[in-house]
């Protein structure tokens, strides 16, 4: 029997606010344990939550970016459970009226076609703290993360393969990153994924029993975990067994999923309206104000890059993978840069430099203006492509004017035959063997000579002019 896979994803996105959702404590990552806490986070008796308006702004922004309707009378609920990293014994979340609902995004499949994935809801909530189990037999609680604002984005069960789930996460991450509401860094926990998967015989409308894969910390592990779970569930059903509703985790070492616990239902959490927070009215003017702050998203930018600038689909995807690079590209074009040349540099030397340094484009000194200036120096023959690589590294580290650096460092390309001919003659005199080889019919000896010429000029000889002059001088031998 063949089975159809059914996948839905729950994505927790940490919102990039300065303070927490209900307390004034900082919401920054990487501080010493319990440094970013106050009495609200510790749930001292009598303290009350105070809503961070910026969190609602970000919630509206996410909902609009994901084509969602917005509950304009929004409230919070209590989700009751006990765990050491949750001192209140309940989490403030949203249950029946999330800030956003009935949304969708479009994903691109492997064959180049697109598919619309519906999004059921997006709700705001507070994050829990973090437990660390020490080798000394004690468990330690860090409440820095307690109260950090989250938005949980819950898809419909519209994905039919691990590859579709991967494509959905990639598209969702791009959109969220473009809004600026989160840095979506999975390695820092600001984007976390839970995956629900079931299988059913082809043609059956009713969903099968699902299992949940919890806290998957990379898109690749999401894909691998779902692929294993597809196979595991199919083997159980083919052998006459039944699937239990479980929460499982993906073991990165073995590539398998392992049982964590039997899954609870929403009734186990005894949701009820949060009595310490009012209903928040989100007026039309508020929504429009946020809508006007949204940037152009990747799909729109890619269409422009292909249609208006003549770039390939591949180039357009690479340039729009992050908003910072896309903004840099557009600023470079506004400064007079050639689209293809700027694209080539951003995908080539710039990308290699950023990877090697472990930095983003906003963390180096290169600017759209000085990159465009450098490309113009290549185009007009002032510097060679080889020298440009040296100029680029200087600009990335120090910034400033490309033209001024080239002049100050003496990197201007030598194109004057009167300057090059004496150097060529000296190269001939210093390389008698190559000259004799050339005279003997070995035309490859000319490659050695042009290499020696470039070395003698420290790479500053204009390659085209140098090659032409050298060939002419060789013909005279």
UniProtKB/Swiss-Prot annotation:
The keyword Cell division does not apply. The gene is gatB. It catalyses: L-glutamyl-tRNA(Gln) + L-glutamine + ATP + H2O = L-glutaminyl-tRNA(Gln) + L-glutamate + ADP + phosphate + H(+); L-aspartyl-tRNA(Asn) + L-glutamine + ATP + H2O = L-asparaginyl-tRNA(Asn) + L-glutamate + ADP + phosphate + 2 H(+). The keyword Protein biosynthesis applies. One of its GO terms (molecular function) is glutaminyl-tRNA synthase (glutamine-hydrolyzing) activity. Gene3D superfamilies: 1.10.10.410, GatB domain, N-terminal subdomain. Allows the formation of correctly charged Asn-tRNA(Asn) or Gln-tRNA(Gln) through the transamidation of misacylated Asp-tRNA(Asn) or Glu-tRNA(Gln) in organisms which lack either or both of asparaginyl-tRNA or glutaminyl-tRNA synthetases. The reaction takes place in the presence of glutamine and ATP through an activated phospho-Asp-tRNA(Asn) or phospho-Glu-tRNA(Gln). Keywords: ATP-binding, Ligase, Nucleotide-binding, Protein biosynthesis. It comes from the Bacteria. This is Aspartyl/glutamyl-tRNA(Asn/Gln) amidotransferase subunit B. Pfam families: GatB_N, GatB_Yqey. Belongs to the GatB/GatE family. GatB subfamily. Heterotrimer of A, B and C subunits. It is an enzyme of class 6 (ligase). SUPFAM superfamilies: GatB/YqeY motif, Glutamine synthetase/guanido kinase. GO terms for biological process: glutaminyl-tRNAGln biosynthesis via transamidation; translation. It comes from Streptococcus gordonii (strain Challis / ATCC 35105 / BCRC 15272 / CH1 / DL1 / V288). Its EC number is 6.3.5.-.
């Amino acid at each position: 029997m063949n089975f159809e896979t059914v996948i839905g994803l729950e994505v927790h996105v940490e919102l990039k606010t300065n303070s927490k959702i209900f307390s004034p404590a900082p919401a920054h990552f990487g501080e010493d344990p319990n440094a970013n806490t106050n009495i609200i986070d510790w749930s001292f008796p009598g303290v009350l939550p105070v809503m961070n308006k910026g969190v609602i702004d970000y919630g509206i922004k996410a909902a609009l970016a994901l084509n969602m309707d917005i509950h304009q009378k929004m409230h919070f609920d209590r989700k009751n459970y006990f765990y050491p990293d949750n001192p209140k014994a309940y989490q403030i979340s949203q249950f029946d009226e999330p800030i956003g609902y009935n949304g969708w995004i479009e994903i691109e499949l492997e064959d180049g076609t697109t598919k619309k994935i519906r999004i059921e809801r997006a709700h705001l909530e507070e994050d829990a703290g973090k437990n660390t189990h020490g080798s000394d037999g004690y468990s330690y609680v860090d409440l820095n993360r307690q109260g950090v604002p989250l938005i949980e984005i819950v898809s419909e069960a519209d994905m039919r393969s691990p590859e579709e789930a991967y494509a959905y996460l990639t598209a969702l991450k791009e959109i969220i990153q473009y809004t600026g509401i989160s840095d979506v860094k999975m390695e820092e926990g600001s984007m976390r994924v839970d995956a629900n998967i079931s299988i059913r015989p082809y043609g059956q409308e009713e969903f099968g029993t699902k299992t949940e894969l919890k806290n998957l910390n990379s898109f690749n592990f999401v894909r691998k975990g779902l692929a294993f779970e597809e196979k595991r569930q199919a083997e159980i059903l083919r052998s006459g067994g039944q699937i239990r509703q479980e929460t499982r985790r993906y073991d990165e070492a073995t590539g398998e999923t392992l049982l964590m616990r039997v899954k609870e239902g929403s009734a186990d959490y005894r949701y009820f309206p949060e009595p310490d927070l009012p209903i928040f009215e989100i007026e039309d003017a508020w929504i429009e104000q946020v809508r006007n702050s949204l940037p152009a998203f990747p799909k729109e930018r890619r269409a422009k890059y292909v249609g208006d600038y003549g770039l390939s689909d591949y180039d357009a995807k690479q340039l729009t993978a992050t908003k910072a690079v896309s903004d840099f590209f557009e600023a470079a074009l506004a400064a007079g840069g050639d689209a293809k040349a700027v694209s080539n540099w951003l995908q080539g030397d710039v990308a290699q430099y950023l990877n090697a340094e472990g930095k983003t484009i906003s963390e180096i000194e290169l600017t759209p203006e000085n990159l465009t200036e450098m490309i113009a120096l290549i185009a007009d023959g002032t510097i060679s492509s080889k020298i440009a690589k040296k100029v680029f590294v200087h600009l990335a580290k120090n910034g400033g004017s490309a033209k001024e650096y080239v002049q100050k460092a003496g990197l201007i390309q030598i194109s004057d035959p009167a300057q090059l001919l004496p150097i060529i003659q000296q190269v001939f005199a210093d390389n008698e063997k190559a000259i004799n080889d050339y005279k003997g019919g070995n035309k490859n000896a000319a490659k050695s000579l042009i290499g020696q010429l470039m070395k003698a000029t420290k790479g500053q000889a204009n390659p085209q002019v140098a090659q032409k002059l050298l060939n002419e001088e060789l013909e005279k031998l």
